[in-house]
A protein has these predicted regions:
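Asp-box/WD-like beta-propeller blade repeats and closely related beta-sheet repeat scaffolds
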Residues: 26-28
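Short glycine/acidic-rich loop motifs that flank beta-strands on beta-rich extracellular proteins
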Residues: 1-2, 18-24, 48-56, 76-83, ...
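Short, intrinsically disordered, low-complexity segments enriched in Ser/Thr and Pro
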Residues: 130-147, 319, 323-326
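Acidic, glycine- and Ser/Thr-rich low-complexity intrinsically disordered tracts
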Residues: 187-326
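Short Cys/His-rich Zn2+-coordinating modules
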Residues: 73-74, 103-105, 156, 237-242
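Right-handed parallel beta-helix
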Residues: 5-19, 33-48, 64-76, 86-99, ...
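Aromatic-lined ligand-binding clefts that engage carbohydrates, nucleic acids, or primary amines
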Residues: 59
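Short, contiguous acidic/charged loop-to-helix segments that flank catalytic cores in large enzymes
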Residues: 110-112, 138-141, 159-167, 243-250
Length: 326
């Protein structure tokens, strides 16, 4: 694990390693100090040869990373695993990863109400898992909140294209999901449910749970944090007002819209009733896989450039010309 600010890690090929490809810690979340680290134009493959389901091709902690234009493949677990704030993950190609894991994703982060301001955009993710393992595409696990995910293309994801694990203040739009095995989008309400009844997530959201402890360690009520992330101005941690849309555990104030989904069930996916109550799920376009030839240049031969007639200028769909190594 490299501990360093103001550095660039670029133009490397990393392969046949036991665990991480690149592990980094930089910046300081609580003081909103960015690490100013760039991880770009790296080819990472054949990682996690020993530590099968620990680590990732790129694993980051802290604040202020740009992770862009990398290609990641042939991994047993996650492609990019991040935590912290102010990260931008864009223009990466991730395929043939999570080959020996299920509760995982090509891009993964989780379990935090204090990791706002991260952006995941314009990534190409395809052909994950293996015959016996069914991972997710982009996985915002365990009530992770405040993420922005748009313009990504996800193809042949064995489980859920976009797995939203009960978080709030999520902005999920203009993504394209093709042939997800279970759901194009799964959005549950595990944090709220964990308070209402005994569930697998209850220990994390009860009064002494790690979600609340993490919140207490974060200066989210400070002027600096509320200026950086205005959502915190309205949020409350008052256990006597658990039905408020501003109570942290509720899957509220999220927007899931304008996503283009090709699904044989003609479904956006599995959206919990409390998500529908507290957030906006709207204007998603659902098509049969039979319509793929109408939308893409030559999808049968792997060309997923959008045809001119279907490239909606009002949306920020994936731009494949910017994706991958340069």
């Amino acid at each position: 694990m490299l501990l360093s600010n103001n550095c660039n890690i670029t133009h490397n090929e990393i392969y046949e390693v036991g665990s991480y490809g690149i592990g980094l810690q930089a910046g300081d979340k609580n003081s909103l100090t960015k690490g100013n680290v760039v991880v770009s134009n790296n080819l990472i493959h054949g990682y996690q040869k020993i530590s099968k389901v620990l680590g990732a091709a790129i694993q980051t902690y802290g604040s202020g990373f740009l992770i862009s234009n990398n290609e990641i493949y042939d991994g047993n677990h996650t492609g990019i695993h991040y935590s912290g704030i102010y990260h931008v993950i864009e223009n990466n190609v991730i395929h043939d990863v999570c080959k020996e894991s299920d509760d995982s994703g090509a891009i993964y982060a989780g379990r935090s109400w204090t990791s706002y301001g991260n952006i995941i955009r314009n990534n190409l993710i395809y052909n994950l898992g293996s015959n016996n393992h069914f991972p997710n595409g982009i996985y915002l696990d365990d009530a992770l909140s405040g993420q922005i995910v748009y313009g990504n293309l996800l193809i042949n994801i064995p489980s859920n294209g976009l797995f939203l694990g009960g978080g709030r203040d999520l902005k999920i739009y203009d993504n394209i999901v093709i042939n997800a095995g279970k759901n194009a989008i799964l959005y549950d309400a595990r944090a709220r449910e964990g308070l209402q009844k005994e569930t697998f997530f209850s220990s994390h959201v009860k009064e002494d749970g790690d979600m609340w402890l993490d919140l207490k360690d974060c200066p989210w009520k400070s002027e600096a944090w509320q200026e950086a992330f205005p959502e915190y101005k309205d949020l409350i941690d008052d256990m006597s007002n658990i039905d408020s849309p501003y109570f942290f555990p509720n899957p509220a104030s999220s927007v899931v819209n304008n996503n283009l989904i090709f699904d044989k069930k003609l479904s956006v996916g599995e959206i919990h009733k409390d998500v529908k109550k507290y957030s906006d799920i709207k204007n998603n376009i659902i098509k049969s896989p039979n319509a793929l030839s109408q939308y893409f240049m030559d999808y049968k031969n792997g060309d997923y450039h959008l045809s001119d007639s279907k490239n909606n200028k009002n949306c920020q769909y994936v731009n494949l010309n910017n994706v991958g190594m340069y």
